[in-house]
Amino acid sequence: MASLSLNPATNAYDFETEEVAGSIQPEGAYHGVTRLIDRRTGRQVIHPKYSALNLFRLFAVHQGMGQPRQMARTTEVLPNAVEVRWPATDAHQGELIARYEVVEPNAVDLTVTLRCRGTYAGYELFMSNYFDPELRPHVYLKANRYGRSAEGPERITPMVNDVFRGTVLVFPRDAHAARRCVDGRWDRSEWGAPTVQMCPVRRHAYPLAFLTDPERRLGTVLMSRPRHCYAISTRYHAEDEADRMVPYSAFDFSLFGDDLTPGDERTVQVRLALTPLNEGMTQPLEMYREFSETPPPAPPP
């Protein structure tokens, strides 16, 4: 079992496994995994200014409920995990418990539990992940395109296009999920929150996304469970830096998605992992299938 050690210089908790080394930062706006290094190649995949597995925004239908980045929290350190708790507030009537657990040989699991005290339609935790801009994004999409048939999901790289330039691409789970990002929540600017146009496109085949460094054949993989993650968002890729929307590569997972009433409790899980890649880049999907066959996590006591 990997252990955590406090780094006095950063106040983050450093860890090392058989295949990766990294840091978990419970404090500040960019809490989460601030460093993740592939020990085989020495490559650091997280953008140095930001983090991964970062709890960014809280939403319901046409409602913004604040940003965990800016909210008070408490931290408990366990042998191989860091647990962060955000108490309920007037703006967000629910307690959030985020557990970052190091998993051998190459992963960090984020388990988030919501203990709801309010009534919310389409509740969402928007979780962000910011990576080295050299990394290229990939997603698997359902192959049911109009007028075309295919034998299985399609793996694609979202590339820049004038049709959706300047927007964030959203790959929803289903028709209900596709409505969430355009129901008004991303027009809410309370407490200085940013607004952006979200562009729902094709439906994802799995709650799975990965990025690649073609030269090193390294995959940075994010995965969740179908009932835990209802949409994946990304920034389109562009070979010309002038065509890029932002100076980093990123994936966001929209978590929960339920209609909630006081007393409801929900738990979701996301895994961040690194893997070598073969020529066919089959490892991320293999990792997802193995992950999806494991039992879902239990909520904390």
Which residues fall in each region the model found?
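Extended, loop-rich substrate-binding clefts of extracytoplasmic carbohydrate-active enzymes
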Residues: F56-V108, L114-G122, R136
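Acidic-aromatic substrate-binding/catalytic surfaces of carbohydrate-active enzymes
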Residues: A2-M71, L78-P79, E83
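Extracellular structured ligand-interaction cores
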Residues: T10-A12, A81, E95-R99, P105-T111, ...
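Beta-strand-rich recognition/accessory modules
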Residues: A2-E16, A175-P300
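Primarily extracytoplasmic ectodomains and periplasmic/lumenal surface modules that are beta-strand-rich
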Residues: V20-I24, G28-V33, N106-V108, R117-G122, ...
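Acidic (Asp/Glu-rich), glycine- and aromatic
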Residues: A107-F164
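Low-complexity, serine/threonine/proline-enriched polar segments
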Residues: Y146-V196
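Broad, structure-driven detector of short, well-ordered beta-strand segments within folded domains
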Residues: E19-P26, G94-V102, G219-M223
